[in-house]
A protein has these predicted regions:
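Glycine-rich beta-strand-to-loop/alpha-helix junction loops that act as flexible
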Residues: 107-112, 118
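ATP-dependent small-molecule kinase catalytic core of the GHMP/sugar-kinase superfamily
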Residues: 2-104, 117-139
Length: 139
């Protein structure tokens, strides 16, 4: 067993951190493409809740399409059906941010962390001024 195999057994994102550089991960994190970079900026929104990755991947509501559709996150529907606290936080963002900004929110993986790619100044201001202590926000 090599170091990447050991890291993958600890968590799907660990091999990405092991490399120490930007990478693009596919599959469950085991397929890494070298030196992926983007000029995008991101706003990370993390609700102060715990979501079990194992619970989501074992959900009866989870289905995987044979053809990759990069416009959607196939874990979102399962997460909304499996975790009431996440559902409350997720739809709470819609009322705070409005439909336009809410549509830009994507999951970062199988947990509760979400992000907005290339947020504009107004969106950043709204998020920092309206989101209370139930989220951690990183820019």
């Amino acid at each position: 067993m090599n170091l990447e195999d050991i890291c993958f057994s600890l968590g799907a994102d660990v091999p990405v951190f092991l490399r120490g550089s930007s990478s693009y991960a596919e599959g469950c994190g085991e397929i890494l493409k070298d030196k992926y970079s983007s000029t995008s900026t991101y706003l990370l929104l993390i609700p102060n809740i715990f979501v079990s990755t194992a619970k989501i991947f074992n959900s009866k509501h989870l289905s995987f399409d044979k053809k990759l559709d990069k416009s959607k996150n196939s874990l979102l529907s399962a997460l909304l059906l499996e975790d009431e606290m996440f559902k409350k936080h997720y739809f709470g963002l819609e009322s705070l941010l409005g439909a336009h900004t809410f549509k830009k929110i994507k999951l970062s993986g199988s947990g509760s962390a979400m992000f907005i790619q290339d947020p504009d100044k107004e969106e950043i201001d709204i998020i920092f001024n309206k989101i209370e202590n139930n989220f951690r926000v990183f820019q």
